[in-house]
Amino acid sequence: MKTRAATTTLTTLFATTLLAVALPAHAYDPKATIADLDARLAKIGAPHVEGAEAVGGRAAPALLFGERKINNNFDVVDAVRKAHNATATVFVKDGEEFVRVSTNVLTPEGKRGVGTQLARNKAYEAVSKGQQFCGEIDVLGTQFDACYNPIKDVGGKIVGVSYIGHKK
């Protein structure tokens, strides 16, 4: 009987410890994470494109939120990583492509993937039509549970895309 009581006590202690160190319920919820990224960006100001700036060795339109240029600025995406243990990216629309201008997604060489393009996949199709995409996706060779949202200027024109991903 003592063994059973000890086992029950240890099981309860283990379960309590797990609950104490568990992440918040929304920590791995892609829709909650993308909502947080979008709220952080909106708090800065309205999105708009103004001029150009090199990212990852290529020219791209400069995406601003309010007066803050997002190209090569990693404060917001790094804050999302810290809060949600998620990858985050802001893309700018460049013609028919979406170019990473701010990201914590790393290339195989270990560098931020700025200057790379959103693949022409189901996420691309959805955001190009102004729709959200949430689901499994490959990002620079790694599988993620991800969400993508179109970023629209005050006139409703798509000027970019926000992305978050939780590694599978």
Predicted stretch roles:
Residues 33, 38-51, 77-98, 134-136:
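Short N-terminal helix-loop-first-beta-strand/juxtamembrane motif that initiates sensory/input modules
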Residues 90-92, 105, 150-151:
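Hydrophobic beta-strand positions
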Residues 11-21:
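Bacterial N-terminal signal peptides
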Residues 28-70, 105-109:
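Extracellular/periplasmic ligand-binding regions of membrane signal-transduction receptors
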